[in-house]
């Protein structure tokens, strides 16, 4: 049972990372340097 939970957690982490990466790539391609609302929602630290 513990192994299944670990696999589910790994899948969730991968999905969240992929979503963050997609948002970042989209923002960069859009040419916006200012932090976007999506970055604030995901909790990314913008400097």
UniProtKB/Swiss-Prot annotation:
Q: Tell me the disulfide pairings in this chain.
A: none
Subcellular location field: Cell outer membrane
Q: Where does lipidation (S-diacylglycerol cysteine) occur on this chain?
A: 20
Gene Ontology terms, cellular component aspect?
Answer: cell outer membrane
Q: Which PROSITE patterns match?
A: PROKAR_LIPOPROTEIN
> What's a Pfam family in this record?
Lysis_col
Covalent lipid attachment of type N-palmitoyl cysteine occurs at 20
Give the residue range of the signal peptide: 1-19
Any GO BP: cytolysis
Alphabetized, the UniProt keywords read: Cell outer membrane, Lipoprotein, Membrane, Palmitate, Plasmid, Signal
* Membrane topology of the entry: Lipid-anchor
Tell me the InterPro entries matching this sequence. Answer: Lysis_col
Function statement: Lysis proteins are required for both colicin release and partial cell lysis.
Q: What is this protein called?
A: Lysis protein for colicin E9
Its organism's taxonomic lineage begins at: Bacteria, Pseudomonadati, Pseudomonadota, Gammaproteobacteria, Enterobacterales
């Amino acid at each position: 049972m513990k192994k299944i939970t670990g696999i589910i957690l790994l899948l969730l982490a991968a999905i969240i990372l992929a979503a963050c990466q997609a948002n970042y790539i989209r923002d960069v391609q859009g040419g916006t340097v200012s932090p976007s609302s999506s970055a604030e929602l995901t909790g990314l630290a913008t400097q």
